[in-house]
Amino acid sequence: GKEGYPADSKGCKVTCFFTGVGYCDTECKLKKASSGYCAWPACYCYGLPDSASVWDSATNKC
């Protein structure tokens, strides 16, 4: 798998600015990642499937 900042439907990072502990781990697992954490201020996932969309600075429109 791959790792990175999971992208939402707009291609933006998933914020964890105001979220509780464990939020990013849950969000990442919903995207079939093995785990995740809050790399403040955005979620970062490990073990994402290759098909998962991740934030890319080259295509960032956020």
UniProtKB/Swiss-Prot annotation:
Q: Indicate the secretion signal residues.
A: none
Keyword Transcription tagged: no
- Disulfide bond recorded as keyword: yes
For this UniProt record, give its keywords in alphabetical order, as a comma-separated list. Answer: Amidation, Disulfide bond, Ion channel impairing toxin, Neurotoxin, Secreted, Toxin, Voltage-gated sodium channel impairing toxin
Q: Which cysteines are joined by disulfide bonds?
A: C12-C62, C16-C38, C24-C43, C28-C45
Q: Which residues carry this modification: Cysteine amide?
A: C62
Please name the SMART domains in this protein's record.
Knot1 (SM00505)
Report the Gene3D superfamilies cross-referenced here: Knottin, scorpion toxin-like
Q: Name one GO cellular component term.
A: extracellular region
Give the UniProt tissue specificity note. Answer: Expressed by the venom gland.
Kindly report the protein's main subcellular placement as a broad class: secreted
- Alphabetical list of Pfam families matching this protein: Toxin_3
Q: Which family does the similarity line name?
A: Belongs to the long (4 C-C) scorpion toxin superfamily. Sodium channel inhibitor family. Alpha subfamily.
The domain comment in this protein's record states:
Has the structural arrangement of an alpha-helix connected to antiparallel beta-sheets by disulfide bonds (CS-alpha/beta).
- Stated name of the protein: Alpha-toxin Tf4
The organism named in the record is Tityus fasciolatus (Central Brazilian scorpion)
Give the taxonomic lineage as stored in the record: Eukaryota, Metazoa, Ecdysozoa, Arthropoda, Chelicerata
